[in-house]
Amino acid sequence: MAYFPMFVDMTERECLIVGGGNVAYRKVIVMLDFGAKVTVVAEDICDELRNLTIDDISNEYKSGLYTANKENRITFIKRRFERKDCDGMEMVIAATDDNALNHEIAEYCKAKDIMVNAVDQKADCSFIFPSYIKEKNLVAAFSSGGNSPVLTQYLKGKEQEILTPFLGDLNEYMGQIREKVIAQYDTEAERKRVFKEILCAAIDNGRIPEV
């Protein structure tokens, strides 16, 4: 059965990522891209994760606990995973190179009703990551239900030709004028007509009107 597409506001929501390798790094990037607060539990972290933080992270990380990033949105905990790490989290990502450990994490999270993704272990996932394109608040995402990541990457490549930075800016503009248009026109039909006219004019002219 296909996965239900649901867009969730992750701003300031607590997300745990277990593992410190390149796969974990890619998941960290995604979660930060959508505003989550990320905790990484790992005995060691890859250079890419180190480069996300301040220059002396190598020294700070040795202390065992380090909160990084100017916005204090990443916490690194240097040790092996413990089940209690999942408690209080809204989302958990098991991204270690140990399939048995990933399965254990997934089983614990499911028992606690915590959303969990075990990388490359579809049966252990209560959610999966889509391929996505993001221009500000405009997001397009593709999922194959975990069957064919190469297909979703193909679709993402096609969509990138359409979903441009201009459309991201245009979407921001449409959001800025939304309440004004709603207040000015009484019926849904009128509002839809005005929004469509503004949208089409901006696309045809290749220019976003001033607010």
Regions found by a protein language model. Give the residues of each.
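Alpha-helix C-terminal capping/helix-to-coil transition sites in glycosyltransferase folds
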Residues: E12, D87-M89, E135
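An accessory alpha-helical subdomain
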Residues: G146-V211
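Glycine-rich, highly charged phosphate/nucleotide-binding loops
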Residues: K62, N69-D87
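Hydrophobic, well-ordered beta-alpha structural blocks that scaffold small-molecule cofactor pockets
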Residues: M1-L52
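N-terminal beta-loop-helix "entrance" segment that forms/cooperates
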Residues: I45-N72
